[in-house]
Amino acid sequence: MSRRHSAEKREVLPDPKFGNVVITKFMNSVMYAGKKSVAEGIVYGALDLIEAKTRQGPLTVFEQALENVMPTIEVRSRRVGGATYQVPVEVRSTRRQALGIRWLIAAARGRNEKTMTERLSAELLDASNNRGSAVKKREDVHKMAEANRAFSHYRW
């Protein structure tokens, strides 16, 4: 990593269907090998499935799912005098969103439904109802931070 210049943030354009920047970021995370049209099909298909199952706006379900998965606190390793401590720190908003998206997709990929569209829609529905692997991951991270609360004075 360069010490001189920090990389400037790129502007992400909103997606064509919902006009939402977060959906675009989600699509980009689903994408493999630059195949954006495939990722687009998967994400829009999953949102259509959600709309068919719940009769609610798919965007509200998606936003609720992401909100339920995003962590507020995490642990980071800090080396102090030969010992490594897991120090709980608050998570920046950009990292919260990135982790939430990453965990949702990882949880969806680990499911047993037949197609990725079905897996993604099922995981989003579960997450919006505070269930599923992605929510469990968030709970585990929060538990870890709570368990290491004694080391919070090592924050930097």
UniProtKB/Swiss-Prot annotation:
Domain of life, source organism: Bacteria
Record keywords, A-Z: Ribonucleoprotein, Ribosomal protein, RNA-binding, rRNA-binding, tRNA-binding
Keyword Ribosomal protein: yes
One Pfam family it belongs to: Ribosomal_S7
Subunit structure: Part of the 30S ribosomal subunit. Contacts proteins S9 and S11.
Family statement: Belongs to the universal ribosomal protein uS7 family.
GO molecular function, one term: structural constituent of ribosome
Organism: Nitrobacter hamburgensis (strain DSM 10229 / NCIMB 13809 / X14)
Gene3D superfamilies registered for this protein in UniProt: Ribosomal protein S7 domain
Disulfides per UniProt: none
InterPro entries: Ribosomal_uS7, Ribosomal_uS7_bac/org-type, Ribosomal_uS7_CS, Ribosomal_uS7_dom, Ribosomal_uS7_dom_sf
PANTHER family, alphabetized: RIBOSOMAL PROTEIN S7 (PTHR11205)
Gene name tied to this protein: rpsG
HAMAP family reported for this sequence: Ribosomal_uS7_B (MF_00480_B)
UniProt-listed SUPFAM superfamilies: Ribosomal protein S7
Protein name: Small ribosomal subunit protein uS7
NCBIfam families in the cross-refs: rpsG_bact
Listed GO CC annotations: small ribosomal subunit
Function summary: One of the primary rRNA binding proteins, it binds directly to 16S rRNA where it nucleates assembly of the head domain of the 30S subunit. Is located at the subunit interface close to the decoding center, probably blocks exit of the E-site tRNA.
Gene Ontology annotations of biological process type: translation
